[in-house]
Amino acid sequence: STDGKISRLYARALAAAVRHLKAWTYSHHRLTPSNLQILRFLNRQGLTVNCSTESESAADSAVAAGLPAVLTVDSAETRAQWSTAAGNRVIVCPAQQRDGVTCSDCMLCHKRGRRVVVAFLAHGTGKRKAQAALAAAGGAQ
């Protein structure tokens, strides 16, 4: 939505539509109490909704709220894995690290109850824009 609130009606319909699938998605919505409630509902219903973040502290907040998190990192990041200040393990997306690995093969972003943050290297046509957003959020080094 344009007001930053996740629609409960849409969330219920989405959960019903994918209930028999291995489905995952990403959300950039703020973690307000209302949005947290809906994101937790969706994850309990079997749709893995990863909280997209641009800083380790934001990823830590999502994990502390009981939600799976992903983290966009600088394209020059050389570490394959590390830990955040809160002790959460971060792993760079396996499909970005190894030839022949696809999302369908890996399924790490779909894994329910995972305690690992999946990091994505900024890439593609929006790489420059992503790098600028990371710098603004304090996530780029």
Task: Locate predicted features.
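Class I S-adenosyl-L-methionine
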Residues: 1-141
